[in-house]
Amino acid sequence: VIIPAHAVELADGVFSLGAARDVEGSLVEGLMFIDYKKGNAKPPWAGGGGGTTTTTCFAFLANGAKWKNLETWIVNPANVEGLSDAFVFSNIAADIQKWEDASSTNILGNGNINTSVLVADESSPDGVNEVYFGNVDSAGAIAVTIVWGIFSGPPSQRKLVEWDQVYDQTDYNWSSSGEANKMDFEN
């Protein structure tokens, strides 16, 4: 995944991909979120926690923008680290379930394993919510999430229509058990 030349940086690690038509013909906007590696963390009792009290997280993409229908998703769990298909799938499904439990809403539908080559949609959505391991061509990027939706206009008309997520297996090693010097896919 490469930050497209047409992308406009809105904030650190947040890029507008512009407008495009979704598979139903609606005009939607794309956003790319890059999750950069941060320094090693130290718990407060060990002398850490001295950072700022502000956050750079986003609470909402846009007031009213949410999934209007259950969204199925697919994952191609193939990876160079040897993480099993079952582990990758069940971990993503469990993370989605935590998100749904926290919101008390069934947001995403069922997931499926897919062995086809998946492509993050940087120019326009293809109607498929995709997760896979690949190359994220941005220094220090652990993963990229691309979200397509309607983020402006009357809040009741706003919605999310697609998301794609890519974990960088070119620059980072991944682990299922929290091994030192590897990214913990469990978290």
Model-derived regions, located:
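Disordered inhibitory propeptide/activation segment of secreted metzincin zinc metalloprotease zymogens
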Residues: V1-D85, A141-L160
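Metzincin-family zinc-dependent endopeptidase catalytic domain
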Residues: V88-N187
